[in-house]
Amino acid sequence: MFNYKILEDEMENLKNEGLYINIRTLESPQGAWIVVNGKRVLNLCSNNYLGFASDERLKQAAKKAIDEWGVGPGAVRTIAGTMKIHEELEKALAEFKGADATIFLQSGFIANQAAIPTVFGDENDAIISDELNHASIIDGVRLSKAKRYVYKHNDMNELEARLKEARDVQKARRILIITDGVFSMDGDIAPLPEIVELAEKYEAAVMVDDAHGEGVLGRGGRGIVDHFGLHGRVDMEIGTLSKAFGVLGGYIAGKETLIRYLKQKARPFLFSTGLTPADVAACLEAVKILQESDERVKRLWDNANYFKSEMKKLGFDLGVSQTPITPVMLYDAKVASQFSRELFEEGIFAQSIGYPTVPKGKARIRVMISAVHTKEDLDFALDKFEKVGKKFAII
Protein backbone atom coordinates (compact mmCIF):
# COMPACT_ATOMS: atom_id res chain seq x y z
CA MET A 1 0.00 0.00 0.00
CA PHE A 2 1.18 3.53 -0.74
CA ASN A 3 3.00 5.31 2.10
CA TYR A 4 0.87 8.44 2.60
CA LYS A 5 3.26 9.69 5.30
CA ILE A 6 5.43 11.01 2.46
CA LEU A 7 2.60 13.34 1.49
CA GLU A 8 1.88 14.31 5.10
CA ASP A 9 5.54 15.17 5.67
CA GLU A 10 5.65 17.30 2.54
CA MET A 11 2.52 19.20 3.56
CA GLU A 12 3.97 19.74 7.05
CA ASN A 13 7.02 21.29 5.42
CA LEU A 14 4.75 23.61 3.45
CA LYS A 15 3.10 24.72 6.71
CA ASN A 16 6.46 25.37 8.34
CA GLU A 17 7.55 27.52 5.39
CA GLY A 18 4.29 29.48 5.32
CA LEU A 19 3.41 28.00 1.92
CA TYR A 20 0.48 25.75 2.83
CA ILE A 21 -2.67 26.85 1.02
CA ASN A 22 -5.73 27.28 3.22
CA ILE A 23 -8.77 27.13 0.98
CA ARG A 24 -11.55 29.45 2.11
CA THR A 25 -15.16 28.74 1.17
CA LEU A 26 -17.46 31.34 -0.37
CA GLU A 27 -21.04 31.34 0.87
CA SER A 28 -22.32 34.00 -1.52
CA PRO A 29 -22.08 34.92 -5.20
CA GLN A 30 -18.98 36.71 -6.51
CA GLY A 31 -19.13 40.45 -6.04
CA ALA A 32 -17.42 43.43 -4.44
CA TRP A 33 -18.46 42.06 -1.04
CA ILE A 34 -18.76 38.35 -0.37
CA VAL A 35 -19.34 35.99 2.55
CA VAL A 36 -16.35 33.77 3.27
CA ASN A 37 -16.46 31.18 6.05
CA GLY A 38 -19.42 33.05 7.54
CA LYS A 39 -17.75 36.48 7.47
CA ARG A 40 -18.72 39.38 5.19
CA VAL A 41 -15.54 40.72 3.59
CA LEU A 42 -14.43 43.05 0.81
CA ASN A 43 -13.34 40.89 -2.12
CA LEU A 44 -9.89 41.89 -3.37
CA CYS A 45 -8.66 38.63 -4.83
CA SER A 46 -10.98 37.41 -7.57
CA ASN A 47 -10.39 37.70 -11.32
CA ASN A 48 -13.91 39.06 -11.78
CA TYR A 49 -12.51 42.25 -13.34
CA LEU A 50 -15.75 43.60 -14.77
CA GLY A 51 -18.29 42.16 -12.34
CA PHE A 52 -19.79 39.77 -14.89
CA ALA A 53 -19.76 36.72 -12.58
CA SER A 54 -23.04 37.81 -10.96
CA ASP A 55 -24.37 40.07 -13.71
CA GLU A 56 -28.12 39.80 -14.20
CA ARG A 57 -27.93 39.68 -18.01
CA LEU A 58 -25.49 36.77 -17.88
CA LYS A 59 -27.62 34.90 -15.35
CA GLN A 60 -30.75 35.30 -17.45
CA ALA A 61 -28.90 34.16 -20.59
CA ALA A 62 -27.69 31.04 -18.77
CA LYS A 63 -31.18 30.21 -17.48
CA LYS A 64 -32.71 30.67 -20.92
CA ALA A 65 -30.07 28.40 -22.47
CA ILE A 66 -30.90 25.60 -20.04
CA ASP A 67 -34.55 25.76 -21.07
CA GLU A 68 -33.63 25.81 -24.76
CA TRP A 69 -30.62 23.47 -24.90
CA GLY A 70 -30.60 21.43 -21.68
CA VAL A 71 -27.79 21.18 -19.13
CA GLY A 72 -25.07 19.40 -21.12
CA PRO A 73 -23.89 18.83 -24.71
CA GLY A 74 -23.92 15.05 -24.31
CA ALA A 75 -20.81 14.24 -26.36
CA VAL A 76 -17.44 15.53 -27.52
CA ARG A 77 -17.75 18.31 -30.05
CA THR A 78 -16.52 16.22 -32.99
CA ILE A 79 -19.26 13.60 -32.56
CA ALA A 80 -22.58 15.02 -31.37
CA GLY A 81 -21.63 17.74 -28.90
CA THR A 82 -21.35 20.87 -31.03
CA MET A 83 -24.51 22.89 -30.58
CA LYS A 84 -25.40 25.97 -32.56
CA ILE A 85 -24.72 28.09 -29.50
CA HIS A 86 -21.08 26.87 -29.42
CA GLU A 87 -20.58 28.08 -32.98
CA GLU A 88 -22.29 31.39 -32.22
CA LEU A 89 -19.83 32.00 -29.40
CA GLU A 90 -16.83 31.12 -31.57
CA LYS A 91 -17.99 33.60 -34.22
CA ALA A 92 -18.65 36.31 -31.63
CA LEU A 93 -15.21 35.83 -30.07
CA ALA A 94 -13.52 36.00 -33.47
CA GLU A 95 -15.30 39.26 -34.25
CA PHE A 96 -14.48 40.68 -30.81
CA LYS A 97 -10.79 39.78 -31.08
CA GLY A 98 -10.42 40.81 -34.71
CA ALA A 99 -9.36 37.28 -35.69
CA ASP A 100 -10.37 35.02 -38.57
CA ALA A 101 -11.75 32.29 -36.32
CA THR A 102 -11.66 30.74 -32.84
CA ILE A 103 -11.93 27.32 -31.25
CA PHE A 104 -13.69 27.19 -27.88
CA LEU A 105 -12.43 24.81 -25.17
CA GLN A 106 -13.09 23.97 -21.54
CA SER A 107 -10.62 26.42 -19.97
CA GLY A 108 -7.68 28.68 -20.72
CA PHE A 109 -5.39 26.07 -19.16
CA ILE A 110 -6.70 23.46 -21.58
CA ALA A 111 -6.46 25.89 -24.50
CA ASN A 112 -2.70 26.12 -23.97
CA GLN A 113 -2.43 22.34 -23.78
CA ALA A 114 -4.39 22.10 -27.02
CA ALA A 115 -2.48 24.75 -28.96
CA ILE A 116 1.18 24.14 -28.15
CA PRO A 117 1.81 20.41 -28.70
CA THR A 118 -0.70 20.17 -31.55
CA VAL A 119 0.95 22.76 -33.78
CA PHE A 120 4.53 22.69 -32.46
CA GLY A 121 4.93 19.12 -31.24
CA ASP A 122 7.68 17.72 -33.47
CA GLU A 123 11.17 17.02 -32.08
CA ASN A 124 12.60 19.23 -34.84
CA ASP A 125 10.55 22.22 -33.66
CA ALA A 126 11.71 24.82 -31.13
CA ILE A 127 9.66 26.56 -28.46
CA ILE A 128 11.03 29.70 -26.78
CA SER A 129 9.17 30.74 -23.62
CA ASP A 130 9.38 33.63 -21.13
CA GLU A 131 10.60 32.41 -17.74
CA LEU A 132 7.53 33.84 -15.97
CA ASN A 133 4.91 32.35 -18.27
CA HIS A 134 1.84 30.79 -16.66
CA ALA A 135 1.84 27.18 -15.44
CA SER A 136 -0.56 26.19 -18.23
CA ILE A 137 2.00 27.29 -20.82
CA ILE A 138 4.76 25.40 -19.02
CA ASP A 139 2.64 22.24 -18.95
CA GLY A 140 1.65 22.72 -22.59
CA VAL A 141 5.31 22.94 -23.58
CA ARG A 142 6.05 19.78 -21.59
CA LEU A 143 3.51 17.92 -23.71
CA SER A 144 5.47 18.79 -26.85
CA LYS A 145 8.52 16.94 -28.17
CA ALA A 146 9.99 20.23 -29.38
CA LYS A 147 13.32 21.50 -28.04
CA ARG A 148 12.65 24.01 -25.27
CA TYR A 149 14.33 27.32 -24.62
CA VAL A 150 13.60 29.81 -21.83
CA TYR A 151 14.53 33.49 -21.90
CA LYS A 152 14.78 35.90 -18.98
CA HIS A 153 11.59 37.78 -18.28
CA ASN A 154 10.86 40.33 -21.01
CA ASP A 155 14.56 40.35 -22.01
CA MET A 156 14.62 40.93 -25.77
CA ASN A 157 18.38 40.48 -26.06
CA GLU A 158 18.16 37.03 -24.55
CA LEU A 159 15.11 36.19 -26.66
CA GLU A 160 17.10 37.04 -29.79
CA ALA A 161 19.99 34.89 -28.57
CA ARG A 162 17.62 31.94 -28.12
CA LEU A 163 16.16 32.57 -31.60
CA LYS A 164 19.65 32.49 -33.12
CA GLU A 165 20.42 29.28 -31.24
CA ALA A 166 17.22 27.61 -32.43
CA ARG A 167 17.73 28.71 -36.04
CA ASP A 168 21.51 28.42 -36.48
CA VAL A 169 22.54 25.68 -34.04
CA GLN A 170 19.48 23.46 -33.72
CA LYS A 171 18.38 24.14 -37.32
CA ALA A 172 14.80 24.04 -36.06
CA ARG A 173 12.09 23.22 -38.57
CA ARG A 174 9.68 25.69 -36.95
CA ILE A 175 10.08 28.13 -34.06
CA LEU A 176 7.38 29.34 -31.67
CA ILE A 177 7.77 32.23 -29.22
CA ILE A 178 5.33 32.11 -26.30
CA THR A 179 4.58 34.90 -23.84
CA ASP A 180 1.91 35.92 -21.40
CA GLY A 181 0.33 39.20 -22.45
CA VAL A 182 -0.14 40.42 -18.90
CA PHE A 183 1.87 38.53 -16.29
CA SER A 184 -0.58 37.44 -13.63
CA MET A 185 1.59 37.78 -10.54
CA ASP A 186 3.38 41.08 -11.27
CA GLY A 187 0.82 42.80 -13.50
CA ASP A 188 3.41 43.90 -16.05
CA ILE A 189 2.84 43.79 -19.81
CA ALA A 190 4.90 41.86 -22.36
CA PRO A 191 6.77 44.00 -24.93
CA LEU A 192 4.71 42.41 -27.69
CA PRO A 193 5.73 44.78 -30.52
CA GLU A 194 9.40 43.94 -29.94
CA ILE A 195 8.61 40.22 -29.72
CA VAL A 196 6.72 40.38 -33.02
CA GLU A 197 9.60 42.25 -34.70
CA LEU A 198 12.06 39.55 -33.61
CA ALA A 199 9.66 36.80 -34.69
CA GLU A 200 9.38 38.29 -38.17
CA LYS A 201 13.16 38.71 -38.38
CA TYR A 202 13.75 35.03 -37.56
CA GLU A 203 10.61 33.66 -39.27
CA ALA A 204 9.14 32.44 -35.98
CA ALA A 205 5.51 32.21 -34.92
CA VAL A 206 4.15 34.15 -31.93
CA MET A 207 1.64 32.92 -29.37
CA VAL A 208 0.35 35.19 -26.60
CA ASP A 209 -1.77 34.16 -23.61
CA ASP A 210 -4.18 37.06 -23.15
CA ALA A 211 -5.92 35.76 -20.01
CA HIS A 212 -5.39 38.96 -18.01
CA GLY A 213 -5.49 41.31 -21.00
CA GLU A 214 -9.02 40.60 -22.18
CA GLY A 215 -11.55 42.93 -20.66
CA VAL A 216 -8.64 45.10 -19.50
CA LEU A 217 -6.42 46.21 -22.42
CA GLY A 218 -7.31 47.41 -25.90
CA ARG A 219 -10.46 49.01 -27.27
CA GLY A 220 -13.35 47.91 -25.07
CA GLY A 221 -11.18 45.22 -23.50
CA ARG A 222 -10.20 43.46 -26.73
CA GLY A 223 -6.81 42.53 -25.33
CA ILE A 224 -3.11 43.04 -25.81
CA VAL A 225 -2.98 42.50 -29.58
CA ASP A 226 -5.54 45.27 -30.03
CA HIS A 227 -3.76 47.37 -27.39
CA PHE A 228 -0.60 47.41 -29.52
CA GLY A 229 -2.35 47.38 -32.92
CA LEU A 230 -0.79 44.06 -33.93
CA HIS A 231 -3.75 42.39 -35.63
CA GLY A 232 -2.59 39.90 -38.25
CA ARG A 233 0.95 39.72 -36.82
CA VAL A 234 0.32 37.36 -33.87
CA ASP A 235 -0.28 33.75 -34.87
CA MET A 236 -2.16 32.46 -31.84
CA GLU A 237 -4.04 34.25 -29.08
CA ILE A 238 -5.08 32.20 -26.07
CA GLY A 239 -8.07 33.52 -24.17
CA THR A 240 -10.09 32.64 -21.13
CA LEU A 241 -13.72 33.28 -20.30
CA SER A 242 -13.22 32.80 -16.55
CA LYS A 243 -11.69 36.17 -15.67
CA ALA A 244 -13.01 39.42 -17.14
CA PHE A 245 -15.83 37.52 -18.87
CA GLY A 246 -16.89 36.09 -15.51
CA VAL A 247 -17.83 32.57 -16.57
CA LEU A 248 -15.74 29.57 -17.66
CA GLY A 249 -13.93 28.30 -20.72
CA GLY A 250 -11.00 29.10 -22.96
CA TYR A 251 -10.32 29.59 -26.64
CA ILE A 252 -7.66 29.92 -29.30
CA ALA A 253 -7.94 32.70 -31.87
CA GLY A 254 -6.03 32.83 -35.14
CA LYS A 255 -6.09 32.24 -38.88
CA GLU A 256 -8.93 30.13 -40.26
CA THR A 257 -6.50 27.42 -41.41
CA LEU A 258 -5.02 27.14 -37.92
CA ILE A 259 -8.43 26.79 -36.27
CA ARG A 260 -9.59 24.15 -38.75
CA TYR A 261 -6.37 22.21 -38.10
CA LEU A 262 -6.87 22.37 -34.33
CA LYS A 263 -10.41 21.04 -34.70
CA GLN A 264 -8.93 18.04 -36.48
CA LYS A 265 -5.90 17.45 -34.25
CA ALA A 266 -6.15 19.02 -30.78
CA ARG A 267 -6.65 16.21 -28.27
CA PRO A 268 -8.53 18.24 -25.61
CA PHE A 269 -11.04 19.18 -28.31
CA LEU A 270 -11.30 15.65 -29.71
CA PHE A 271 -11.50 13.71 -26.46
CA SER A 272 -13.28 15.90 -23.92
CA THR A 273 -16.88 17.11 -23.80
CA GLY A 274 -17.44 20.80 -24.46
CA LEU A 275 -18.90 23.33 -22.06
CA THR A 276 -22.54 23.38 -21.01
CA PRO A 277 -25.10 25.51 -22.86
CA ALA A 278 -25.55 27.68 -19.76
CA ASP A 279 -21.84 28.49 -19.63
CA VAL A 280 -21.69 29.18 -23.35
CA ALA A 281 -24.75 31.45 -23.30
CA ALA A 282 -23.38 33.46 -20.38
CA CYS A 283 -20.05 33.87 -22.20
CA LEU A 284 -21.86 35.01 -25.32
CA GLU A 285 -23.79 37.61 -23.32
CA ALA A 286 -20.55 38.94 -21.79
CA VAL A 287 -19.08 39.41 -25.27
CA LYS A 288 -22.23 41.24 -26.37
CA ILE A 289 -22.03 43.62 -23.41
CA LEU A 290 -18.39 44.47 -24.14
CA GLN A 291 -19.23 45.08 -27.79
CA GLU A 292 -21.96 47.50 -26.72
CA SER A 293 -19.98 49.62 -24.27
CA ASP A 294 -16.53 50.14 -22.73
CA GLU A 295 -17.97 51.74 -19.58
CA ARG A 296 -16.97 48.83 -17.31
CA VAL A 297 -13.44 48.75 -18.65
CA LYS A 298 -13.04 52.48 -17.99
CA ARG A 299 -14.41 52.07 -14.46
CA LEU A 300 -11.96 49.23 -13.82
CA TRP A 301 -9.03 51.44 -14.77
CA ASP A 302 -10.33 54.40 -12.76
CA ASN A 303 -10.56 52.17 -9.68
CA ALA A 304 -7.15 50.60 -10.25
CA ASN A 305 -5.39 53.92 -10.81
CA TYR A 306 -6.93 55.42 -7.67
CA PHE A 307 -6.12 52.45 -5.44
CA LYS A 308 -2.54 52.08 -6.67
CA SER A 309 -1.83 55.79 -6.34
CA GLU A 310 -3.08 55.88 -2.75
CA MET A 311 -1.21 52.68 -1.81
CA LYS A 312 2.04 54.17 -3.09
CA LYS A 313 1.39 57.32 -1.04
CA LEU A 314 1.09 55.10 2.04
CA GLY A 315 4.52 53.67 1.26
CA PHE A 316 3.68 50.21 -0.07
CA ASP A 317 5.89 48.55 -2.68
CA LEU A 318 3.69 47.62 -5.67
CA GLY A 319 6.43 46.15 -7.82
CA VAL A 320 6.31 46.73 -11.58
CA SER A 321 2.56 46.51 -12.21
CA GLN A 322 1.14 48.25 -15.29
CA THR A 323 -2.40 46.88 -14.95
CA PRO A 324 -5.17 46.52 -12.33
CA ILE A 325 -3.25 43.55 -10.89
CA THR A 326 -1.68 45.07 -7.78
CA PRO A 327 1.05 43.06 -6.03
CA VAL A 328 1.73 44.35 -2.53
CA MET A 329 5.30 43.13 -2.16
CA LEU A 330 6.16 41.68 1.27
CA TYR A 331 8.87 39.24 0.10
CA ASP A 332 8.77 36.91 3.15
CA ALA A 333 6.21 34.09 2.76
CA LYS A 334 5.38 33.85 6.47
CA VAL A 335 4.89 37.60 6.73
CA ALA A 336 2.64 37.58 3.66
CA SER A 337 0.55 34.75 5.08
CA GLN A 338 0.18 36.50 8.45
CA PHE A 339 -0.58 39.81 6.73
CA SER A 340 -3.37 38.16 4.73
CA ARG A 341 -4.90 36.60 7.86
CA GLU A 342 -4.81 39.95 9.65
CA LEU A 343 -6.50 41.65 6.69
CA PHE A 344 -9.23 39.00 6.78
CA GLU A 345 -9.89 39.77 10.44
CA GLU A 346 -10.23 43.42 9.42
CA GLY A 347 -12.79 42.55 6.71
CA ILE A 348 -10.48 42.35 3.68
CA PHE A 349 -10.22 39.17 1.59
CA ALA A 350 -6.83 39.42 -0.13
CA GLN A 351 -4.82 36.22 -0.37
CA SER A 352 -1.06 35.88 0.04
CA ILE A 353 0.92 34.43 -2.86
CA GLY A 354 4.13 32.50 -2.27
CA TYR A 355 6.35 29.83 -3.78
CA PRO A 356 5.89 27.99 -6.16
CA THR A 357 3.40 30.46 -7.67
CA VAL A 358 6.09 33.15 -7.37
CA PRO A 359 9.85 32.73 -6.77
CA LYS A 360 11.10 32.24 -3.22
CA GLY A 361 11.69 35.58 -1.54
CA LYS A 362 9.02 37.27 -3.70
CA ALA A 363 5.91 36.65 -1.57
CA ARG A 364 3.14 39.19 -1.78
CA ILE A 365 -0.51 40.05 -1.29
CA ARG A 366 -2.01 40.17 -4.77
CA VAL A 367 -4.85 42.68 -4.89
CA MET A 368 -7.32 42.35 -7.74
CA ILE A 369 -9.36 45.47 -8.40
CA SER A 370 -12.79 45.23 -10.04
CA ALA A 371 -15.12 47.58 -11.88
CA VAL A 372 -17.80 46.83 -9.27
CA HIS A 373 -15.79 48.30 -6.39
CA THR A 374 -16.97 51.72 -5.24
CA LYS A 375 -14.70 54.50 -4.01
CA GLU A 376 -16.01 53.78 -0.52
CA ASP A 377 -14.91 50.15 -0.91
CA LEU A 378 -11.44 51.20 -1.98
CA ASP A 379 -11.12 53.73 0.84
CA PHE A 380 -12.12 51.01 3.30
CA ALA A 381 -9.40 48.77 1.86
CA LEU A 382 -6.81 51.55 2.01
CA ASP A 383 -7.61 52.21 5.65
CA LYS A 384 -7.20 48.53 6.56
CA PHE A 385 -3.99 48.12 4.55
CA GLU A 386 -2.56 51.15 6.35
CA LYS A 387 -3.54 49.72 9.74
CA VAL A 388 -2.09 46.27 9.09
CA GLY A 389 0.94 47.66 7.27
CA LYS A 390 1.88 49.75 10.29
CA LYS A 391 1.27 46.83 12.65
CA PHE A 392 3.74 44.70 10.69
CA ALA A 393 6.16 47.64 10.24
CA ILE A 394 5.84 47.36 6.45
CA ILE A 395 5.15 51.09 6.11
Curated annotation (Swiss-Prot):
Pfam families assigned to the protein according to its UniProt record, in alphabetical order: Aminotran_1_2
Xref: PROSITE patterns: AA_TRANSFER_CLASS_2
Top-rank taxon: Bacteria
Cofactor(s) annotated in UniProt: pyridoxal 5'-phosphate
Function: Catalyzes the decarboxylative condensation of pimeloyl-[acyl-carrier protein] and L-alanine to produce 8-amino-7-oxononanoate (AON), [acyl-carrier protein], and carbon dioxide.
Family, similarity comment: Belongs to the class-II pyridoxal-phosphate-dependent aminotransferase family. BioF subfamily.
Subunit structure: Homodimer.
NCBIfam families assigned to the protein according to its UniProt record, in alphabetical order: bioF (TIGR00858), gly_Cac_T_rel (TIGR01825), PRK06939.1 (NF005394)
The protein's name in its UniProt record: 8-amino-7-oxononanoate synthase
